[in-house]
Amino acid sequence: SEPYHLIPQQWESSAHAEVNARAFTYPIGEDRASCVRCHSGVGYIDWANGVPEEEQRTDYQVHTCAVCHDPHDSDSPNQLRVFDTVTLPDGTEIDDAGPSATCMSCHNARRDPISGVEGAVESGRISTPHYSTGAELMNATGGYTWGFDMPTSGHGEAIEDSCVACHMANTPPSGTVAHNEIGGHTFAMTNADGIQNITTCEGCHDGEDSFNFEAFRDYDGDGTIETNDEEVAGLRELLVEALAERGVSVLDHYPYYEIAEGTETSVDLYGAIWNHKFTESGGSAVHNLRYTVALLQLSYEQLLGEPVPNAYILEASIPVAEETGG
């Protein structure tokens, strides 16, 4: 029979419980102290408790219940160690994230785009964001924008407790398909059979049976309006081609990009590289379609000097203060 308490069963099927996952076997230690807070359960506890980075524990440990929740703190909602307030790597302060602050404290780019890109120009070494940029995408930040204001889909504002509302929506009832395989403490949006947890989506997108539904426009200019994911994938492929024209090869392994000898580097080149990596996550279209599309379209234009051909362009704008000199 099914256990009375479902949370442990759900957690056991989550990525947070995968003992042999790369996230929890990645080399950590004194020379990689900044990795500890997210790649070690006890390291996260130390970080949340304000332990100096160089003193945080480096033991290999998955993210168990007591990593996110403090069993001895009844004052914090859900006994979460991090709640409501989180500062993203680019300095963006989120003060109303609720329980999603816990998610955002790790699922972010780990680097600031401006210092990353401009630092790459000075050093000649490519800088890219870390994996899992959901926190930035939900808050329309973290991409390299060349100083433009970017359009946004606004999921971060429209959905209360944004990360948790979608990834932890109730799992389907016992005895039904995908029970304990999506939602809840599985944190999964899709199970192995492709069944999606669209509970939160249905609140606004009535009648849709998938969160990867048809886009409103042809953003990649291929003459066909496809799904949101396909439009983003098309733009990313166009950006790969544009980077190749400028002497950059995209690799499937570290360091992810290779600049040909003799290539003229610039902010435009490094900014486009940053944005290509930033939008790599499969959730980019769902987290913030308009911001993702605008970043990719702008990167293409900055590289080649012209907009994506035949595409519906989401316009980025110069901030009013800069435009007027005020």
Feature names for model-found ranges:
Residues 7, 98-99, 197-200, 295:
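Generic detector of short, well-ordered, non-transmembrane alpha-helical segments enriched
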Residues 1, 65-69, 205, 257-264:
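Phosphate-binding glycine-rich loops and adjacent basic patches that engage nucleotide phosphates
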Residues 11, 102, 204, 299:
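Divalent metal-coordination and catalytic microenvironments
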Residues 207-209, 214-326:
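Mature extracytoplasmic or organellar-lumen-exposed domains after removal of signal/transit peptides
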